[in-house]
């Protein structure tokens, strides 16, 4: 038996492949293939546009897939949300679907969009949002380069943004946030009802979320003389409590902990002054609480 899994092709592909690699899945694909090889005979991977994955999961063509909440909502896909995987092309944070207008536009509030023309890839989501605000507008599908359409072609856009830099570069300002979206592992309901496929998805969830949790974290090991243990532990942050192990035939101990990578630069000199020696920093692939 195999689990048929859809992964996003395009802007999220590289980050997704890196995540799977850290989770223990080595995906190999050439530029023309949509069927990556994977070092797990129980997985069949298909690459496709993130926009399409929820529909194919909903219809049962795929057992499960990775796509954003925005595209699940756009497709009105009736799927099981198995796991939140909060990552995007450049960061580990959600993206936002925003309404944006030109900096010098007279449009100041959402209600000012009444009767205006809006371009977006997420037509259904945008229409539902405007309807909830009591606004009737012309919402048209954008085939790309959405930011450059304001103000000559449309009055506003609804577009995904991670940092807002692309909007600012095109002299646009955010009028409102329609929703926040992040990648979700979602499953077809029949596949989720299958015990073998559900267990496979749950195992995959443990590994993928562990790999995400490990990003920006490192392990730190050091040797500490017995009379400096309290001093070192006093400055050492940890997820819970550091591991302290007695060294063989010695009054020294080995201390090991996991911490945020950003803390390490400033912490290592402090640990050294507190009495730690033989300090080793190492990367992590997965952190499973």
Curated annotation (Swiss-Prot):
* Catalysed reactions, as listed in the record: 1-(5-phospho-beta-D-ribosyl)-ATP + diphosphate = 5-phospho-alpha-D-ribose 1-diphosphate + ATP
Top-rank EC class of the record's enzyme: transferase
Q: Which cofactor names does the annotation list? A: Mg(2+)
Gene3D superfamilies, per database record: 3.30.70.120, Periplasmic binding protein-like II
Gene Ontology BP term (one): L-histidine biosynthetic process
GO cellular-component terms in the record? cytoplasm
Q: Name one GO molecular function term.
A: magnesium ion binding
Q: Which UniProt keywords apply?
A: Amino-acid biosynthesis, ATP-binding, Cytoplasm, Glycosyltransferase, Histidine biosynthesis, Magnesium, Metal-binding, Nucleotide-binding, Transferase
Which is one Pfam family of this protein?
HisG
Q: Which family does it belong to?
A: Belongs to the ATP phosphoribosyltransferase family. Long subfamily.
> What functional role does this protein have?
Catalyzes the condensation of ATP and 5-phosphoribose 1-diphosphate to form N'-(5'-phosphoribosyl)-ATP (PR-ATP). Has a crucial role in the pathway because the rate of histidine biosynthesis seems to be controlled primarily by regulation of HisG enzymatic activity.
Q: What is this protein called?
A: ATP phosphoribosyltransferase
Q: Name its species.
A: Desulforudis audaxviator (strain MP104C)
